[in-house]
């Protein structure tokens, strides 16, 4: 029996441009690390493609769907940066936002304003399918079965057949079943079924022999029909967020595939048949339960992006070194014990994600990957890097070695940081920053040395003149050098959890400082020069031994957050009333603070006031319990300066 026999006549309308799938490719797992990064979950599976000039190719967009009619994008994995924000222009649609173009009646349609001036016979075909529920609010109770939606699918398929539609979008439509009549839409090149409730596809899906893009993400699929192998032109297949326990065997026979998304399923293994997909350029197996990646991966020599993050891999095959075109390799959040030496063959590698594994070392052959711009091994057990490795990677701009077991800076001297602008060594066991280590790092703007064992800062700290963010929290620092005054580009300075007894007067030179965190030190007095920090927005002095605030604090006109809790304050200066921007004030747990200045009532923007465990004898308890607005009102009412 021929499943594909029908009386339908294929449309003679042709798609004027090919290669849609190739142009719609992207780097998975964007987020902080891009291709090798820790991207978001990317549950949205929207459509959208670059305008291919095929204005004559009719499109059917189901009104209950997203209204997107283009190549598969969505999530952080495929995004068309050139897509128009308003969705006008027909197929040159969207980036997975789930928005749909609407007409005055709220129905989904595809429209190009330029078509209005075209003769009727030359205008592109447009089909609008009105969903009976499209203008009604979403029900608060879940329907047992969206019968009406399934009926509308039948109508949509009929129009697809009759109108010669090439792109069909049935996404986000509560569909449970795809009718067998889908076989009549043999001219389809793009089919979007994402975000439905489909449990299985009919065998007739294999009749769509012209299909190039197929989006099935965010459904409940556990398998695929064998007939899908007839779709020999299929380029892009999206199966993210389904219930696949294995890679369906039929996929290995789709040798035309260039992009395959299998993210967030229940896959435990990858068959050796993977080697047949030699045209793949992008493969995402992220967020599955895979324990082993076999040697077949080495046959995919055209791969440029491979994402196997968030699995249970302990080893990689040496064959990974055959994938010489890889530019993005994401291995983060696995259980990797080692990285094969063959990784050094990947000379096109730009992003390599190795965060949060069980690595104790990395291979010296990584020196060959000179195109890398980011090196990130956060959350492993590495004690040292191969000699001079970072210096060999001269293109590096970001280095993250946090949460490892480093006892000292990597060997390689100042040369290893020449082009670096961000260094993160948080949560290691480093007790010293070598003198002159940043002498060539003229672009260094961010340094994070939080949670180490530093007892002092290098004498050349004054040469770090381009530093913008400096985090030295949770160390054992006893003194801040006077040369800190030279860091005049500094905006964020974190010194919490140290052993500082005083702050140098030269702190007043840091005129761009926005955040100053001195929590949990042994500070008794703040310098008067603190009032020169006019850009300061957050001043955190919690848990010190401060007995009074300098009157110059009233000059901090941009201050929004002031925390002086858990100190030995005896009073607040009247000048605190000049802090017009102040929103949050923490003065709790100051056992010697018995009264508040009436001038505090001048802080009109104050939203939060914590005075817990302060023996305020002048303000009635019921007023204190009423919150900051009531306290401020009381202060104003009892002020000797009523006119204020």
UniProtKB/Swiss-Prot annotation:
SMART domains xrefs: LRR_BAC (SM00364), LRR_SD22 (SM00365), LRR_TYP (SM00369)
InterPro entries assigned: Leu-rich_rpt, Leu-rich_rpt_typical-subtyp, LRR-SigEffector_domain, LRR_dom_sf, LRR_R13L4/SHOC2-like
Sequence ranges of the LRR repeats: 164-185, 187-208, 210-231, 233-254, 256-277, 279-300, 302-323, 325-346, 348-370, 371-392, 395-416, 419-440, 443-464, 466-487, 489-510, 512-533, 535-556, 558-579, 581-603, 605-626
Biased composition (Low complexity): 1-19
Start-end of Polar residues biased regions: 99-117
Family: Belongs to the SHOC2 family.
Protein name per the record: Leucine-rich repeat protein soc-2 homolog
Native source organism of the sequence: Drosophila erecta
